[in-house]
């Protein structure tokens, strides 16, 4: 695992794999408005007028050069990563059709990446329907992940399709794409003709971690994922190690929630905690040794900043795997508006990372205004300080008095985690009821 693609700039320094870069700083202070300095807005146009005008130009101009098309796409994406771009009522069907045409055709890397990002962003803004877009793009995304010549395109396809799959919330599809990602890890990228490409392998770890947050039932997929991720802890790349470690922590977190304690009176004992994961990680002791080494890595070849990130992340990963029932391991939070958003689980952290990757500086605005985004991150409160009259917001104005800080709702991190567990159980029950209904209809007709 030593090859680096020097031409690929998959993420900026602020969007790297580690938890710290995404959660540090003041996400609530990120600019989500002014674009005059970047030359995006012209004259007296508002951002929405400029967005609609650019979309119209892209749709209506039949003969447009690749360079001009790239400029239009870049302008659309820049606006969408500074504002909650939900109010595009006209030309939605035409825009989706055009983006799919660009996506499926032979394009430059930049044009293709911009198109992928825009499609994901409009799904997050509920402009496009996730299920429809996922169905229309599945084949192409898989082809790009397997056969694209550019590592950047492979990485983009892996990350963005994993996000669409997570948003789709279909466990069968999650496992199917997850198995593909596992094959990438097991072969160090060779299965997609990217052997020892740390970018591709790192993205596969990151994407697999995201998909693991969607798993709600027992399957062999969990053990296969754990084995593949454990092997990547020995990778030469710190980014790969971090992505693999966080994904492993998310896996243990999910297993701990899926499997009820065999003996609740003794659920704090080392014996019960260990036996609970025996079939997932047969050699758990060796895994813990590896994690302790990473949590205290002192090699001079690693920069001071990287070493700090490595230590902090792997201390949390180690505690999650060593003491699955421990409380308050993760104490990350971000400030959005006047609300404190607790990211106190690996599920929330990995999902926030992927949203931050696609949405950039508009993450906080999308979170504040979109119930869909807040639900995806497991946030049950409202965002204080947001005007109920904002036309972009999907809040019910009748509940304006309930825009309160989640931290003040009286829920401890333990209570929030228990609430998530109840929701997962209800989700599984709903899936069973739906499956039973479909089977009853099918068999009644045959």
From Swiss-Prot:
Pfam families, sorted: IFRD
SUPFAM superfamilies named in the record: ARM repeat
Major location (coarse): cytoplasm
GO cellular component: cytosol; nucleus
Keyword Cell membrane: no
Modified residues (Phosphoserine): 393, 397
Localization of this protein: Cytoplasm
Keyword annotations: Cytoplasm, Phosphoprotein
Intrachain disulfide bonds: none
Annotated segments matching region Disordered: 411-431
Phosphoprotein found in the keyword field: yes
PANTHER family assigned to the protein according to its UniProt record, in alphabetical order: INTERFERON-RELATED DEVELOPMENTAL REGULATOR, INTERFERON-RELATED DEVELOPMENTAL REGULATOR 1
Family the UniProt entry places it in: Belongs to the IFRD family.
Protein name according to UniProt: Uncharacterized protein C20F10.03
Record organism: Schizosaccharomyces pombe (strain 972 / ATCC 24843) (Fission yeast)
Lineage of source species: Eukaryota, Fungi, Dikarya, Ascomycota, Taphrinomycotina
């Amino acid at each position: 695992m030593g090859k680096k693609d020097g031409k690929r700039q998959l993420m900026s320094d602020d969007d790297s794999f580690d938890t710290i870069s995404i959660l540090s700083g003041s996400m609530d202070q990120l600019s989500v408005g002014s674009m005059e300095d970047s030359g995006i807005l012209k004259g007296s146009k508002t951002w929405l007028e400029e967005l609609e005008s650019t979309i119209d130009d892209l749709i209506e101009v039949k003969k447009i050069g690749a360079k001009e098309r790239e400029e239009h796409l870049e302008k659309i994406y820049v606006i969408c990563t500074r504002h909650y771009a939900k109010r595009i009522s006209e030309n939605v069907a035409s825009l989706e059709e055009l983006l799919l045409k660009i996506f499926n055709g032979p394009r430059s890397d930049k044009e293709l990446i911009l198109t992928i990002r825009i499609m994901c962003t409009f799904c997050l803004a509920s402009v496009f329907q996730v299920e429809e877009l996922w169905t229309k793009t599945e084949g192409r995304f898989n082809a790009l992940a397997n056969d694209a010549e550019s590592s950047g395109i492979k990485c983009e396809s892996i990350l963005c399709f994993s996000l669409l799959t997570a948003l789709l919330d279909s466990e069968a599809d999650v496992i199917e794409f997850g198995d593909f990602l596992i094959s990438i890890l097991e072969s160090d990228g060779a299965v997609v003709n990217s052997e020892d490409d740390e970018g591709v392998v790192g993205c596969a770890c990151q994407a697999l971690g995201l998909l693991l947050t969607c798993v709600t039932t027992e399957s062999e997929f969990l053990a296969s994922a754990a084995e593949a991720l454990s092997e990547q802890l020995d990778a030469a790349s710190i980014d790969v190690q971090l992505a693999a470690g966080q994904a492993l922590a998310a896996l243990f977190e999910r297993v701990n929630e899926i499997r009820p304690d065999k003996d609740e009176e003794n659920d704090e004992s080392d014996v019960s905690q260990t036996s609970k994961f025996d079939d997932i990680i047969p050699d758990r002791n060796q895994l813990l040794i590896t994690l302790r080494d990473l949590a205290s890595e002192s090699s001079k070849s690693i920069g001071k900043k990287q070493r700090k990130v490595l230590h902090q992340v792997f201390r949390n990963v180690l505690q999650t795997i060593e003491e699955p029932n421990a409380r308050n391991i993760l104490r990350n939070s971000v400030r959005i508006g006047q609300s404190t958003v607790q990211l106190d689980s690996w599920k929330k952290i990995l999902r926030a990372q992927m949203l931050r990757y696609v949405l950039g500086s508009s993450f906080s605005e999308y979170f504040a205004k979109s119930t869909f985004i807040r639900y995806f991150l497991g946030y049950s409160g409202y965002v204080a300080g947001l005007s109920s009259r904002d036309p972009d917001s999907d809040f019910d104005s009748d509940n304006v008095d309930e825009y309160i800080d989640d931290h003040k709702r009286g829920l401890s991190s333990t209570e929030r985690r228990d609430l998530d567990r109840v929701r997962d159980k209800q989700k599984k029950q709903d899936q069973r009821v739906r499956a039973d209904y479909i089977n009853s209809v099918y068999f009644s007709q045959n």
